[in-house]
């Protein structure tokens, strides 16, 4: 056998090697009702170990693509037994932090100076240029600018998952308009100089706390897998099979279920589209773009993989026992991959202080500086097209970014593999002030359209974020006196000077993107500081953080998992994709 099976860690096993290994390991070990038992395909059930056919059926009954060949490498974990505590996360994030901080429906953390014009709730920025005008002056991009450090599309894609796991800010109901003026003669949205046109924007939902308008986070603020499972019981129940398997529901092709019962989802029903045509995920934005939908589908498969793993190990568990254990592992995987792989790429190595355990005095809520400005860094990564590749990494035809929005039918047609292969091989754009036209100049009709850069600027004003320099002061940084201190790029200096009088006047999101990057990272000093603060609080203020919640064997099992392994055990993808998927292959 060319590859050996190891009882610890992940190994790329041929199907034959996997089956051989499943027949030679020892008998089951007894555990209590909260034990996570080594699956019986690895240890046998008493004197009656599973047959090869049993193993095949369990892991591939819903994987027709993987079933078509025995040459696909399998990425199955092996682990000693482990025991969970007798408590699982609540779906809405309640009973985690003192005062239920971080629970779905909580207000975001405002840890900066209030930037509202009246100090209470009137949007800021009234003395600055309009958001679309600034977008045209600063955020334009005339040609592709590939990232200089060889990261793959999985960096922005995984960041999208992390963002949607931690925060969802809905719009106000009834509508409270804060529309974006379109400059007269705008080359995209007003080429005939009609004038008086706007890009529609509704203010975010908010509550007044101590006389100040504060935005509401509809998701659990914890990095807890809510992007997969939801942040409310109704959504969670809708997605579960409740049939004894512990599974999440799937549709044809082992894809996510569709929103057949019309739960809150995007696009909203007022668009006149049948909600049953769109995937239903834990977060309402699961259909936002094809890359995001692809990862959401993968995480549903990952849950069902672990549910099967656990079910075989302990057949006495009921549906909820299986489901909660699988949910705990997937949530832990998301945390592990984010902090071990994703954050060091974004911020550089050793950016966060070492973890020392749960700290009840830490506020785990998402800060407005993070959600409204900082973590919108992903928008500058976006490429003009999404690559789709076949099993030999040949193009299957690119999809333009504006054609990749709310198009689940393109996944039902081809599956998730072409998009995963594309993300693995495609270098995203540089982190800078430039945004591709696909999301900055998305024209949908006279006087209507979409500009993601302008939206980000306007949303910062809606949320009462202070200026760039004020945020630097609030986070303990020295303010910048000139645009040359913000960026060494002469072109960017010129762009900023055309839009703002000084760094004191600059919108936070724009200033963050313009900065020179910190050594070893992809972002500038201000964004680095905002991210460091947020990710340390997210970790330290979570009572269920995987490094302190899981027992040692289960923790070791989770820490062995990688995004590459997750992809290869849940799809037909094999050696055509690199194992370390956050960087493109160097060959």
Give the label of every model feature segment.
Residues 1-4, 304-307, 476-485:
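Short amphipathic alpha-helical segments with coiled-coil-like heptad repeat character
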Residues 2-17:
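Bacterial N-terminal signal peptides that target proteins for export
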Residues 14-27:
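Classical Sec-dependent N-terminal signal peptides that target proteins to the secretory pathway
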Residues 31-305, 309, 328, 332-454, ...:
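N-terminal accessory/cap region of cofactor-dependent oxidoreductases and related radical enzymes
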Residues 307-322, 463, 472, 476-478:
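N-terminal leader/propeptide and maturation segments of large enzyme subunits in energy/redox metabolism
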Residues 317, 321, 337, 341-345, ...:
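Short, flexible/disordered secondary-structure transition segments
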Residues 322-328:
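Alpha-helical scaffold segments that form or flank carboxylate-/histidine-based iron centers
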Residues 481-499:
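Short linear, low-complexity motifs centered on an aromatic residue
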């Amino acid at each position: 056998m060319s590859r050996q099976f190891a009882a610890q860690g992940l190994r790329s096993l041929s199907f034959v090697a996997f089956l051989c290994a499943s027949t030679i390991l020892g008998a089951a070990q007894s555990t209590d009702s909260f034990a996570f038992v080594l699956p019986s395909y690895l240890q046998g059930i008493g004197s009656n170990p599973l047959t090869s056919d049993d193993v095949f059926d369990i892991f591939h009954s819903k994987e027709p693509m993987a079933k078509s060949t025995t040459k696909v490498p399998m990425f199955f974990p092996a682990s000693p037994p482990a025991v969970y505590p007798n408590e699982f996360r609540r779906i809405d994030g309640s009973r985690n932090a003192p005062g239920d901080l971080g629970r779905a429906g909580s207000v975001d953390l405002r840890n900066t100076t209030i930037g509202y014009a009246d100090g209470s709730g009137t949007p800021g920025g009234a003395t600055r240029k309009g958001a679309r005008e600034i977008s045209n002056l600063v955020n334009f991009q005339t040609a592709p600018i590939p990232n200089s450090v060889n990261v793959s599309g999985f960096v922005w894609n995984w960041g999208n998952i992390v963002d949607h796991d931690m925060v969802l800010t809905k719009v106000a109901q009834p509508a409270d308009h804060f529309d974006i003026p379109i400059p007269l003669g705008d080359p995209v949205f007003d080429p005939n100089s009609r004038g008086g046109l706007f890009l529609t924007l509704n203010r975010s939902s908010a509550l007044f706390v101590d006389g100040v308008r504060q935005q509401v986070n509809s998701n659990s603020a914890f990095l807890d897998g809510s992007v997969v499972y939801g942040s409310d019981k109704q959504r969670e129940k809708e997605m579960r099979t409740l049939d004894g398997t512990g599974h999440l529901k799937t549709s044809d092709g082992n894809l996510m279920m569709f929103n057949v019962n019309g739960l809150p989802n995007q696009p909203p029903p007022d668009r006149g589209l049948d909600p049953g045509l769109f995937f239903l995920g834990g977060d309402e934005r699961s259909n936002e773009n094809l890359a995001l939908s692809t990862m959401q589908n993968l995480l549903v498969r990952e849950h069902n993989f672990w549910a099967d793993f656990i079910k075989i190990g302990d057949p006495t568990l009921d549906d909820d026992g299986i489901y909660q254990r699988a949910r705990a592992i997937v949530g832990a995987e998301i945390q592990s991959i984010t902090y071990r792989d994703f954050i060091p790429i974004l911020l550089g190595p050793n950016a966060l202080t070492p973890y020392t355990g749960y700290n009840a005095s830490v506020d785990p809520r998402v800060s407005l500086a993070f959600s409204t400005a900082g973590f919108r860094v992903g928008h500058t990564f976006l490429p003009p097209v999404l690559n789709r590749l076949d099993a030999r990494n040949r193009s299957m035809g690119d999809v333009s970014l504006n054609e990749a929005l709310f198009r689940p039918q393109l996944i039902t047609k081809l599956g998730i593999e072409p998009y995963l292969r594309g993300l693995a091989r495609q270098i995203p754009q540089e982190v800078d002030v430039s945004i591709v036209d696909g999301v900055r100049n998305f024209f949908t009709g006279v006087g209507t359209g979409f500009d993601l850069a302008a939206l980000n600027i306007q949303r910062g004003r809606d949320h009462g974020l202070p200026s760039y320099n004020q945020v630097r002061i609030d986070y303990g940084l020295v303010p910048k006196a000139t645009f040359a201190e913000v960026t060494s790029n002469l072109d960017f200096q010129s762009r900023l000077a055309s839009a703002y009088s000084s760094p004191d006047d600059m919108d936070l999101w724009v200033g963050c993107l313009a900065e020179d990057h910190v050594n070893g990272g992809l972002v500038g000093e201000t964004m680095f500081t905002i991210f460091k603060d947020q990710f340390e609080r997210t970790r330290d203020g979570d009572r269920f953080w995987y490094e302190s919640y899981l027992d040692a064997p289960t923790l070791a099992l989770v820490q062995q998992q990688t995004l590459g392994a997750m992809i290869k055990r849940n799809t037909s993808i094999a050696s055509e994709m690199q194992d370390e998927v956050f960087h493109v292959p160097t060959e």
